[in-house]
């Protein structure tokens, strides 16, 4: 009897160990069957593919909707990576875009609407369990029997507490006109491919291992600990919950947000999204939106390079490529979902968008004499309705990891005035998720196109700020007034973009509007800057009441550099694409020293590296350092591009001409927004320089110098020598 009991116990112990071993990976064998769907219109083509892989169950969800409404030509793509269950991710996939459509700012301020929807989704999960009706099947006979028979007298309603340890990431892309908005929380990622297969991260993963000191302090104050990739909730000496969370999206995880003594933004996990906006240009090839299952195995550059080669070199179909990329995620042991969005050639001609928030697209504003040949108004660009005549709404069954349920919705059945509970925009929806961060980083981009700049003639009795500035109304009206020679065409720096499109807010209220600036590497926390003499660009980042300007114009041999945009650090984070010159490596060592020893020590090392001939760091005279309320006298009084003295304006050579045009645009923007002062370089765009057909700049510069905007050569030399003396004396002067 005892031997039989021992054998039985031993058998159950072996069975338990085998189950535990198999559950560690999810399944004994991966589920490699894929769900794939594709659709296209005259602007874009997308393919979505998802696979359970080694995951114990499918917890990813996604939404792909080619035409979100009937009036604005808006497309929506979202990936939601659930953890602790698929319910929160599935709810986001079914409801996020509906909440966005029903938001009051959807038509007038899409950026603000997207930002608010992230927060409202979290609140909906916390306050009511009505969301479960969207993800739990209604045709379950057992549930119906229990409700109708056994539970004829239902038990008293328990207090709703929300999903304690379930949550989801979110990475969504909204395309309207020729504008693209990316919002994300968590470790799902969106990557852009530019011409030639250049990978650009449009989102930055929110992970505890990348937390800043302020974030770690917030977690500790809320009663938790941030240990690498883990967040633990601690009570006394006991760890009552150990949750592997690779992100902070507040869609669920309310066990980490229940400290009643703290505000929402001070909880252990928060739900503040990163929002980025950018123009869609002809050099953009495709977007890759994927869950963490893909990015934990391969990096962004490898994925983009593979897709680019398969598309352009081998000519493979987008559907086949998407399924191949999904298989890369098998090694992660997790679910994998990938959405590929391909931009069709010539579909996105440049348009100015309603400054109120991506409302109605209008054609590029250019003066009548400087309008480029063949330019036309594309504001009424249509959408192929035939491709969406009978759209479908699809989603995973909550009880099945591979099954799907289909429903067809006729377009005439959609009530545009319906509420969020009843209005289901046409499109294709499924399962996926994300996590967040407590700091909002936003960035965006805008291009400056060719046209003539209207500059009123300055008066000797008036100041530059009062008189010498761009007349936005005249420019918008197409006036051809200019101070340059008749044959000269001047870069149009439409001040309406800065005045209306931005909201530069230095008050206590955080800035919510994005600043549309050209991005060479538009990520949210780190900016990879392409240092190229023929492609000088800059990026402006907003971080809660702090503003930073990063400008790439260095021509001292460096190819790429990565700058860390934080208010307390030394200001630079080393990173590279391709070959890195020794000067960059030395700068990287200086950066580490600067972070360890503080800003003052960093400045000392900057000076030391400069004396040794290093460049491409904050001490480099070819680089304008970041600009913000915290920065002090480290910024030149009048930052300029290298070799920008007015007495060099008549020098020959194509490179010198381009440099003169760049300086011209820099100075003209000073005229348009004198109140911005050091932010004068904000609206520069390299491709706008190509519109400057004539080199007859002398009359214009003479007029600007008379107005006191440009320094006279002697004054410029004196100021340059003064800066050199502060930097290091005669040696720096010779440099």
From Swiss-Prot:
CDD domains: PP2Cc. Mn(2+) 1 binds at residues 81-82. Keywords: Hydrolase, Magnesium, Manganese, Metal-binding, Protein phosphatase, Signal. Residues 392-424, 565-584, 631-653, 712-735 are annotated as: Disordered. This is Probable protein phosphatase 2C 17. Mn(2+) 2 binds at residues 81, 292, 334. GO terms for molecular function: metal ion binding; protein serine/threonine phosphatase activity. Residues 1-26 form the signal peptide. It holds the Pfam family PP2C. Residues 45-343 form the PPM-type phosphatase domain. GO terms for biological process: signal transduction. Belongs to the PP2C family. It catalyses: O-phospho-L-seryl-[protein] + H2O = L-seryl-[protein] + phosphate; O-phospho-L-threonyl-[protein] + H2O = L-threonyl-[protein] + phosphate.
């Amino acid at each position: 009897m005892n031997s039989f009991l021992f054998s039985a116990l031993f058998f159950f112990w072996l069975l338990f160990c085998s189950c535990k071993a198999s559950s560690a990976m999810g399944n004994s064998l991966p589920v490699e069957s894929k769900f794939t769907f594709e659709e296209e219109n005259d602007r874009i083509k997308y393919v979505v593919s998802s696979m359970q892989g080694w995951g114990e169950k499918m917890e990813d969800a996604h939404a792909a909707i080619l035409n979100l409404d009937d009036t604005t030509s808006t497309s929506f793509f979202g990936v939601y990576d659930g953890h602790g269950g698929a319910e929160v991710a599935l709810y986001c996939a079914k409801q996020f875009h509906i909440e966005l459509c029903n938001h009051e700012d959807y038509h007038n301020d899409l950026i603000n609407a997207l930002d608010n929807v992230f927060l409202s989704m979290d609140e909906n999960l916390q306050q009511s369990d009505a969301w479960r009706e969207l993800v739990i099947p209604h045709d379950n006979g057992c549930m119906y029997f229990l409700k109708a028979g056994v539970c004829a007298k239902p038990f008293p309603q328990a207090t709703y507490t929300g999903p304690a340890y379930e949550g989801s990431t979110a990475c969504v892309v909204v395309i309207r006109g020729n504008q693209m908005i990316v919002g994300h929380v968590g470790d799902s990622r969106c990557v852009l491919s530019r011409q030639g297969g250049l990978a650009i991260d449009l989102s930055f993963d929110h992970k505890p291992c990348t937390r800043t000191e302020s974030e770690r302090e917030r977690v500790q104050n809320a009663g938790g600990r941030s240990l690498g990739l883990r967040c633990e909730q601690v009570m006394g000496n006991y760890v009552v919950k150990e949750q592997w969370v690779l992100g902070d999206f507040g869609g669920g995880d309310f066990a980490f947000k229940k400290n009643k003594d703290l505000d929402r933004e001070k909880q252990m996990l928060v739900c503040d999204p990163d929002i980025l906006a950018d123009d869609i240009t002809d050099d953009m090839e495709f977007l890759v939106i994927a869950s963490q299952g893909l990015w934990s195995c391969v990096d962004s550059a490898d994925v983009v390079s593979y897709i680019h080669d398969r598309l352009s070199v081998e000519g493979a179909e987008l559907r086949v490529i998407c399924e191949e990329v999904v298989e890369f995620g098998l090694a992660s042991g997790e679910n994998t979902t990938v959405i590929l969005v391909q931009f069709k050639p010539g579909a996105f001609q440049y348009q100015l968008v309603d400054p109120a928030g991506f409302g109605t697209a209008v054609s590029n504003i250019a003066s009548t004499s400087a309008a480029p040949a063949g330019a036309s108004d594309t504001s009424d660009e249509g959408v192929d309705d035939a491709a969406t005549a009978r759209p479908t709404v699809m989603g995973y069954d909550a009880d099945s990891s591979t099954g799907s349920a289909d429903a067809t919705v006729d377009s005439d059945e959609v009530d545009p005035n319906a509420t969020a509970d009843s209005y289901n925009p046409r499109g294709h929806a499924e399962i996926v998720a994300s996590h967040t961060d407590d700091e909002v980083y936003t960035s965006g981009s805008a291009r400056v196109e060719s046209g003539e700049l209207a500059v009123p003639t300055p008066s000797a009795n008036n100041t530059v700020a009062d008189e010498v500035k761009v007349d936005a109304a005249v420019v918008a009206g197409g006036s051809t007034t200019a101070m340059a020679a008749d044959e000269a065409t001047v870069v149009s720096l439409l001040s309406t973009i800065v005045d209306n499109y931005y909201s530069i807010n230095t008050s206590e209220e955080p800035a919510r509007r994005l600043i549309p600036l050209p991005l060479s590497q538009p990520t949210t926390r780190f900016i990879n800057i392409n240092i190229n003499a023929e492609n000088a660009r800059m990026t402006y980042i907003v971080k809660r009441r702090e503003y930073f300007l990063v400008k790439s114009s260095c021509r001292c041999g460096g190819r790429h550099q990565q700058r860390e945009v934080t208010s307390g650090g030394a200001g630079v984070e080393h990173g590279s694409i391709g070959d890195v010159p020794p000067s960059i490596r030395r700068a990287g060592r200086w950066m580490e020293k600067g972070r360890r020893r503080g800003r003052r020590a960093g400045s000392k090392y900057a000076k030391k590296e400069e004396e040794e001939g290093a460049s491409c760091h904050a001490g480099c005279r070819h680089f304008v350092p970041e600009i913000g309320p915290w920065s002090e006298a480290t910024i030149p009084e009048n930052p300029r591009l290298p070799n920008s003295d007015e007495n060099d304006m008549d020098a020959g050579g194509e490179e010198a001409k381009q440099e003169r045009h760049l300086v011209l645009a820099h100075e003209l923007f000073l005229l348009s927004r004198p109140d911005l002062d050091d932010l004068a370089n904000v609206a520069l765009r390299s491709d706008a320089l190509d519109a400057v057909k004539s080199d007859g700049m002398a009359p214009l510069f003479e007029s600007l110098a008379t107005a006191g905007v440009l320094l006279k050569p002697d004054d410029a030399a004196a100021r340059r020598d003064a800066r050199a003396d502060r930097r290091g004396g005669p040696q720096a002067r010779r440099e």
